[in-house]
Amino acid sequence: MILLIDSGNSRLKVGWLDNGAREPAAVAFDNLDPHALGDWLGTLSRKPTLALGVNVAGAERGEGIRAALAGHGCPVHWITSRPQLLGLRNGYTQPAQLGADRLVSLLGVRSRLAQTHPPFVLASFGTATTIDTVGPDNAFAGGLILPGPALMRSSLARGTANLPLADGPVVDFPVDTHQAIASGIAAAQAGAVVRQWLAACRHYGCAADIYVAGGGWPEVQQETERLLAQAAAIAGAPPLPAYLDRPVLDGLALLAAQPDPQSL
């Protein structure tokens, strides 16, 4: 059994590949809890022989994960960004600078597609929101990074004297502070998605598919789908965003299925 580890800024998500079979559902922990992974490993009836993962939570957290796995006799191999990964080309000026979770999640989306596929946009709404585009040629064209919905909200509350930690509906014309903040956050997130979708449509000359992921998606789903519908007047009917529960783990599973995953 090979463990699949997605170590993000807020959450640690774990899956596995066992004789070609995937986990029925990912296991998620608070990534600030140093004992959660080790405690969970102690409950397993079958011990993993290898862990394959990506870590964007820093070297200290990566070492904590390594130590927890080592305590159960399981080595970990961290996937890092590089110019090409299983045919997915990394268009970053400095390929190693691209977050490994972003590259692997794009690989996870591509693993679902036919060999010939339209361009696609993947928007992941976590602590940070990333919106990345891949062309029909399997080349990562580039992407955006912005604060995620929760980080936008908490930043306003922390960085200003009079703004609350808002909880309000998204409306066209907000008439109180909670509405104004909630609507502004949704507009910023949705507007960024639509911007990148339109850019992909123009660049490739055809409609791009849209995939979404992350815990922040429900908060911005309605606004994103509404703005995409409005954008249809410009670029043709937009696709309904397809939600993916764990694209990073999907990409790691594809890597784990290779003959020698530790060489990747």
Swiss-Prot record:
Residues annotated as catalytic: 101 (proton acceptor)
UniProt keyword Transferase, yes or no: yes
Assigned EC number: 2.7.1.33
Gene Ontology terms, MF aspect: ATP binding; pantothenate kinase activity
Compartments (UniProt record): Cytoplasm
NCBIfam families xrefs: PRK13328.1-5
Top-rank taxon, per record: Bacteria
Family membership noted in the UniProt record: Belongs to the type III pantothenate kinase family.
SUPFAM superfamilies (alphabetical): Actin-like ATPase domain (SSF53067)
GO biological process, one term: coenzyme A biosynthetic process
Pathway: Cofactor biosynthesis; coenzyme A biosynthesis; CoA from (R)-pantothenate: step 1/5
Assembly with partners or alone: Homodimer.
InterPro entries xref list: ATPase_NBD (IPR043129), Type_III_PanK (IPR004619)
UniProt key word Aminoacyl-tRNA synthetase: no
Protein name as annotated: Type III pantothenate kinase
Keywords (A to Z) from UniProt: ATP-binding, Coenzyme A biosynthesis, Cytoplasm, Kinase, Nucleotide-binding, Potassium, Transferase
Cofactor: NH4(+); K(+)
Residues holding ATP: 6-13, 127
Main location: cytoplasm
